[in-house]
Amino acid sequence: MIFNSLSIKRLSSTXTSLPFKKHAKLNFDLYSPQHSTYGKLPYHCQEPIIFLHGIYGYSKSFNSDYQQLSNLLHTPIYSVDMRCHGETENCLPFTYDALAGDLDNFVITHNIKKPSLIGFSLGAKLAMLAILKSPHLYTSGVIVDNVPLKQPRIKPNLTAFGNALRDSVFKSGVKRNDPSWISKSFNVMKDVCSDMPANFYLLHNIQPKPSYLKKYSTEESENSLFCKVPIRELSSHVVENVPDWPEEDLAGVKTDVPILVVKASTSGFVNEDGVAALXKHFSDFTIVEVAGTHLVMKERPQEYISAVGRWFYQQNCKKAAALTKAKKTNDQKITQQPILSYKKIEIA
């Protein structure tokens, strides 16, 4: 996808005025398993799951999927807002290292024992980095359509996304009390970004009401719309850092933590170079292909949920087999131990 150079030029003038914090306190939603017919299926996940959204997403981006997965796997699912997203505080730096630090801190602070991670796009890269840097904290990961590589080719897309959000708030003139604010905001986005599915994904950031938890980005004039992300301050950091990957820091780092990679068939993210990069860092990875674009979770929710459910079931079967083998080996050791002889001592 190609966007005009004017969009990139406008974005480069973004000012930075957000505070710097080592750890952001992550807002989250918790989805607990509910009674359903899924209970009759053999899908179980012994550990809780944390879901990580994509860029300009938030904790409710795929909320119906979270509940389905929680029911299917009989495990709680935490869906978090990353820093500067949803209801989590606005702060810098916006780098993968900072996001991974926030995630580790969230796991430790909430005493979540060895969770598995499911990450989409930006969240997929974050999941891989967290597992590589802190493998002792995580059980496994599901990586939705991304790979551990630098991706400068996506910078024009990210530029267009940022400009679409910014123009819909600061240049559209649409008022929050306008009953047609949704359609008007979407029309503004279309003039800046030609990716219609992405625009629908981005639109949830535009709101007619402020938040009680954090300061939303808005025009100073009365009755203007709000944006959940601090778009003017954050845009340049997104374009610079989201395509990145800390290759130098992770040179030679490899883990046996298992991951499933969900490849969207037409997105081009999981290519040959990406598969080679996966093999450098993960000794136990599986790739499953689902028909669709990068937004495959929106386009084919049941297919990806089924693929994730099957993979967790297979992982649990492996764990059960390993435990059975270990128990059998231990029992054999016990039976092979010599019986201690003793002499009867008579007391006069």
UniProtKB/Swiss-Prot annotation:
This protein's GO CC annotations: mitochondrion
Catalysed reactions, as listed in the record: ethanol + acetyl-CoA = ethyl acetate + CoA; acetyl-CoA + H2O = acetate + CoA + H(+); ethyl acetate + H2O = ethanol + acetate + H(+)
Keywords assigned by UniProt, alphabetized: Hydrolase, Mitochondrion, Transferase, Transit peptide
Compartments in which it is found: Mitochondrion
Transit peptide, start-end: 1-19
MF annotations from Gene Ontology: acetyl-CoA hydrolase activity; carboxylic ester hydrolase activity; transferase activity
Active-site residues annotated for this sequence: S121, D145, H294
Stretches assigned to the AB hydrolase-1 domain: 49-305
EC number: 2.3.1.268, 3.1.2.1, 3.1.1.-
Job description of the protein: Alcohol acetyltransferase that catalyzes the synthesis of ethyl acetate from ethanol and acetyl-CoA. Can also function as a thioesterase by hydrolyzing acetyl-CoA in the absence of ethanol, as well as esterase hydrolyzing ethyl acetate.
The family this protein is said to belong to: Belongs to the AB hydrolase superfamily.
Name assigned to this protein: Ethanol acetyltransferase 2
Gene transcribed to yield this protein: EAT2
